[in-house]
Amino acid sequence: MANEDKKDFNAMLHDSKDMPKFQTITDQKSIEKYGGSRMYFAPPIDYDKVMKRIPYGKVITVGKIREYFAELNGADFTEPITAGIFVSIAAWASYQRSEDETPYWRTLKANGELNKKYPGGIEAQKERLEAEGHTIIQKGRTNIKYFVKDYESVLFDLR
């Protein structure tokens, strides 16, 4: 996100944007990719509420949060683009608050990847995760990415 210091992320977090809502998709490739046509859109605050549930020493992926919302709401899947945006909004909103912190650093991208769009970037997320006992590994030579080693073993079960 750009110009984070000029944005009110807490206002964005509480703007439901006419969500929750459902949409039926008709594109056959998307239906095959996501396993159905019923797509759920969760509001930003719902991502924040789920992210707050992740305890010290545990992690979650955005994909697992999306699966949880779909299952909870009788959808085939949760829309992926807004999911990524809303997770970032929750992170920045927490960063802007002086209380009621959301432990956003525990929410990872696919395959346990760290999220460079969080406040402080990769380095800040890496520092916080390592402080909770996680090992961070680097992958790639030119397009370097960072991951929580064996993240599957410390995934939090939302159910």
Q: What is the meaning of each model-derived region?
A:
Residues 2-159:
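Nucleic acid-binding interface residues in structured DNA/RNA-binding domains
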